[in-house]
């Protein structure tokens, strides 16, 4: 392989890619041309590396493992585009982003997607505790060789985000319970998909359904009990915003790997006779008699029992609490503000290289807005000093990055 010929072929392939990107076409023929150029580029780089070349002209040659993987991706996408050219969706508008490898690998993996939208999940009825997922207006699923590609409807419910092709069952590619184990305290979440709201299917949703109560699968209403629900059963959609009321109980979800008895006991009720009750001398036995869902939650703490009361010795004193304003008569301070990344990096640099030039430094903080956790203004860091002279030395020896500003002030604690 001559170096000049290899360089010409490589530049031609890269030029074709740039033309296809700048054209911003919606035709499958142009996208097939783009992926063909990517395939030729990666195969050329792979061949050059196998012959020991490190560069082709000014272009560095990656390792064979990198170019081989990229060539496989380009071949896969080129074959998909050629399949779509002979499908009923060949006349539809397709962007290069719709046919990118990254979107093809995004959930649901191995499918083509169009029309991204955001699905919001709020945990425990807390507007500042949210997660966002991506749903799609249309999902193209590859069937058998005879069926080819077929379209599927993508939607969300209280369990997760799924797609459903034709009369087939729901296929979930995002389940909210996984993240709920990390971010939720009560096991409840609220799903908002456009103007429709759903609740978690694993228990009574927070701040709703106060007319009945669910304890370990049993409904408190005598004439209304919930049986087993399939994975494709969803809660009734409520118009947004949903009415929020106080919940009756605080259900607790268990993990997937936690063993549970097949035959469950009836919900806990007060003992009918004094002899059947469990005394305070056996707390472990008492905790086994009461289901998890009836244990007090963080918002409704139970009064301490005699056995759980802390005993404090007469001579012991409560340890002194830390206070950032430790200097009487006024604490010299600096408020350093900038963007979030600047403030965090500056704090890290101060702690690592200039620790002797200040007394205390805070984490990065913002001013919150009137609703939720909306941030106002720049990110800030508060730095305190022993005296004004130490603050002056700090300003002289610790450089301030461009874009950040410092405000000097003296803070006095009134009480």
Curated annotation (Swiss-Prot):
Entry keyword annotation includes Magnesium: no
Region (DNA-binding domain): 330-415
GO CC field: host cell nucleus
Annotated Gene3D superfamilies: 3.30.70.330, E2 (early) protein, N terminal domain, subdomain 1, Papillomavirus E2 early protein domain
Compositionally biased residues, Low complexity: 267-287
InterPro entries according to UniProt: E2/EBNA1_C_sf (IPR035975), Nucleotide-bd_a/b_plait_sf (IPR012677), Papillomavirus_E2_C (IPR000427), PPV_E2_N (IPR001866), Reg_prot_E2 (IPR033668), Regulatory_protein_E2_N (IPR036050), Regulatory_protein_E2_N_1 (IPR042503), Regulatory_protein_E2_N_2 (IPR042504)
Protein origin, superkingdom: Viruses
GO biological process, alphabetically ordered: DNA replication; DNA-templated transcription; regulation of DNA replication; viral DNA genome replication
Region named Disordered: 221-313
Region described as Transactivation domain: spans on this chain: 1-205
Keyword annotations: Activator, DNA replication, DNA-binding, Early protein, Host nucleus, Phosphoprotein, Repressor, Transcription, Transcription regulation
Pfam families with a match to the protein in the record: PPV_E2_C, PPV_E2_N
GO MF term list: DNA binding; DNA-binding transcription factor activity; nucleotide binding
Annotated compartments: Host nucleus
TM annotation in the entry: none
Subunit structure comment from the entry: Binds DNA as homodimer. Interacts with protein E1; this interaction greatly increases E1 DNA-binding activity. Interacts with protein L1; this interaction enhances E2-dependent replication and transcription activation. Interacts with protein L2; this interaction inhibits E2 transcriptional activity but not DNA replication function E2. Interacts with protein E7; this interaction inhibits E7 oncogenic activity. Interacts with host TAF1; this interaction modulates E2-dependent transcriptional regulation. Interacts with host BRD4; this interaction mediates E2 transcriptional activation function.
Function noted in UniProt: Plays a role in the initiation of viral DNA replication. A dimer of E2 interacts with a dimer of E1 in order to improve specificity of E1 DNA binding activity. Once the complex recognizes and binds DNA at specific sites, the E2 dimer is removed from DNA. E2 also regulates viral transcription through binding to the E2RE response element (5'-ACCNNNNNNGGT-3') present in multiple copies in the regulatory regions of the viral genome. Activates or represses transcription depending on E2RE's position with regards to proximal promoter elements including the TATA-box.
Protein's UniProt name: Regulatory protein E2
Species of provenance: European elk papillomavirus
Classification of source organism: Viruses, Monodnaviria, Shotokuvirae, Cossaviricota, Papovaviricetes
